[in-house]
Amino acid sequence: MVFSNNDEGRINKKLPKELLLRIFSFLDIVTLCRCAQISKAWNILALDGSNWQRIDLFNFQTDVEGRVVENISKRCGGFLRKLSLRGCIGVGDSSLKTFAQNCRNIEHLNLNGCTKITDSTCYSLSRFCSKLKHLDLTSCVSITNSSLKGISEGCRNLEYLNLSWCDQITKDGIEALVRGCRGLKALLLRGCTQLEDEALKHIQNYCHELVSLNLQSCSRITDEGVVQICRGCHRLQALCLSGCSNLTDASLTALGLNCPRLQILEAARCSHLTDAGFTLLARNCHELEKMDLEECILITDSTLIQLSIHCPKLQALSLSHCELITDDGILHLSNSTCGHERLRVLELDNCLLITDVALEHLENCRGLERLELYDCQQVTRAGIKRMRAQLPHVKVHAYFAPVTPPTAVTGSGQRLCRCCVIL
C-alpha cells in the first residue's frame, strides 16, 4: 500500500481494523497499555480482548491485587487462553471465581505461589473451566484432596498438573484426580510428603499417557511404588526421584525393563543405588540425556563405563559427592560418543579422587559448556588453565582454600577473602 504526501489520514484510518488488530497482537502487555493512551481509537484497539489471549503478570506480582484479575477477566472474557499469576500473593479465591466465570476458554493457568487460594478456587475452575489443560498450583499450601476431586470432575482435559509442596495431598486425593484426568502427561508432586506407594499404584492404573513425573522429596516412596509406575507408564520420559532415600537397585531395574524412552533421571541423594542398577538401566535406556546422580555414594567408574557405551545422547551429568569416581571413569566418558558430541554439563564437585588428569581427558569434550569442580582437592589452578586453553568457552567453577597466613608479629592489616574462584 502506497500513501501520497497529501494524504491526511493517520495509520488507523488507512488500514482496516482487522489488520491493525493483527499488528497489535504482537505487542506485550506494557506496550499495549502504552498504546492505549495514544488516542481513543488506539485505546479501543489495544484493549480489544483478542489481543489479550496470553497474559503474564509475574513482573508485576507485588502490585497485582484481586481487582486487577477481575478487571482483566472482564476485558478478555472468552479470548483469554493463558494466564500466569505466579507470585501474585494478593490474589484470592473471590477474584479467581470471577475470573473462572468470565474466562471459560482458559487452557493454561499458573497460580504458583498464590498462597491465599484454597479449595474454593479449584471448585470454581472445575465448574467453569472445562478446557483447562495446564494448571500450576505450586506452594498453594491450603489445597487439599477436595481440590483434586473437584478438578477430576470438571477439568478432564488436564494434561499438566503441578502440586509441588502442597503437603496436605494424600493418596486419596491422587486417586480421585487420576480417575477423572486420565490424559495427564505431566504430574509434579515435589514435597508432597504424605504420599506413599499406594498413590503411585493409582497413577499406574489410570495415567498410561504419563510422560513426566516428579516425586522429589516424597520420602515415603519405596521400590514397590516405583515398580508400579514403571509397569503402567511405559511412555515415561522424565522421572525425578531425588530425595527418595528408600530406593534401591530394584527401582532402576524396573525403569530399565519398562521405560525405554526415559530421557531424564534425577536420583540425587538416593544413596542405596549401585553400579548394578545403573548398568541395567544404561543397557536398556539409550535415550538418556540428563542424569542427576548427586550423592549416589556407592557408584564407581563402572557406572560411567556403562553410560559411555550405551547412552550416546547424554548431555548433562551430575556426579557431585560421588567420591568413588576416578580419572579413569572420566577417561571413558570423554572418549565416548556422548563425550565427543553431546556432553554439555558435568558436575564433579566433591569428587575427591579426581585430579588434573581428568581435565586432560575432558579436552576431548569439545561441546562442554560448564564444569563444576568445587572441593576437588587434587585439581589445581594450573590444570584448569591448561584445559581452558583447549576449551576456552567452558565455564569452570572451582574452589581453592586460602593458604593459612603466618601469625602476624605486629599489627594486622585488612585482608581480602580469595576463597572462591570462578574461572
Curated annotation (Swiss-Prot):
Stretch list, region Interaction with Calmodulin: 80-90
Residues where lipid is bound covalently (S-geranylgeranyl cysteine): C420
CC per GO annotation: cytoplasm; membrane; SCF ubiquitin ligase complex
Domain F-box: 9-55
Record-level GO BP terms: negative regulation of NLRP3 inflammasome complex assembly; protein ubiquitination; regulation of autophagy; regulation of inflammatory response; regulation of phosphatidylinositol 3-kinase/protein kinase B signal transduction; SCF-dependent proteasomal ubiquitin-dependent protein catabolic process
Bilayer topology: Lipid-anchor
Motif mapping: CAAX motif: 420-423
Keyword entries, A-Z: Calcium, Calmodulin-binding, Isopeptide bond, Leucine-rich repeat, Lipoprotein, Membrane, Phosphoprotein, Prenylation, Repeat, Ubl conjugation, Ubl conjugation pathway
Main subcellular location of this protein, as a coarse class: membrane
LRR repeats, residue ranges: 61-87, 88-113, 114-139, 140-165, 166-191, 192-217, 218-243, 244-269, 270-295, 296-321, 322-350, 351-375, 376-401
Example of a GO MF term: calmodulin binding
Record Gene3D superfamilies: Ribonuclease Inhibitor
Cross-link Glycyl lysine isopeptide (Lys-Gly) (interchain with G-Cter in ubiquitin): residue positions: K201
Pathway(s) of this molecule: Protein modification; protein ubiquitination
Domain of life the protein comes from: Eukaryota
Subunit structure: Part of the SCF (SKP1-CUL1-F-box) E3 ubiquitin-protein ligase complex SCF(FBXL2) composed of CUL1, SKP1, RBX1 and FBXL2. Interacts with calmodulin; may antagonize substrate ubiquitination by SCF(FBXL2). May interact with PIK3R1. Interacts with PTPN13.
Domain observations: The CAAX motif is a signal for the geranylgeranylation of FBXL2 and is required for its association with cell membranes and the recruitment of substrates to the active SCF(FBXL2) complex.
Function, in words: Calcium-activated substrate recognition component of the SCF (SKP1-cullin-F-box protein) E3 ubiquitin-protein ligase complex, SCF(FBXL2), which mediates the ubiquitination and subsequent proteasomal degradation of target proteins. Unlike many F-box proteins, FBXL2 does not seem to target phosphodegron within its substrates but rather calmodulin-binding motifs and is thereby antagonized by calmodulin. This is the case for the cyclins CCND2 and CCND3 which polyubiquitination and subsequent degradation are inhibited by calmodulin.
Identification of the protein by name: F-box/LRR-repeat protein 2
Species lineage: Eukaryota, Metazoa, Chordata, Craniata, Vertebrata
Gene: FBXL2
